[in-house]
């Protein structure tokens, strides 16, 4: 199982793929957030040698911005977990990560998935 953290904003989606757990390689990508985001993400995962069916996507609830992507990924057969932002921030603090940027948030989301393995 590959854990993929996604930080979503109005215009872009920051993605972090953990290939070998939190200590292993991490790959990142910024994709446009729009109608083709699901397809673009699936294609990028495939190029990283991660079949979408082997991925577990972790994202935080961000008002309306996460909904289209979460539903689209779920309909494509990809496992998706939507996490409460407050819970994620406390998790990051517990890891000693106090910086708050989109790329760091994507990494923290991937770590959360890897360590907590949400349903």
Regions found by a protein language model. Name each.
Residues 1-119:
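Phosphate- and other anionic-substrate recognition elements at nucleic-acid/protein interfaces
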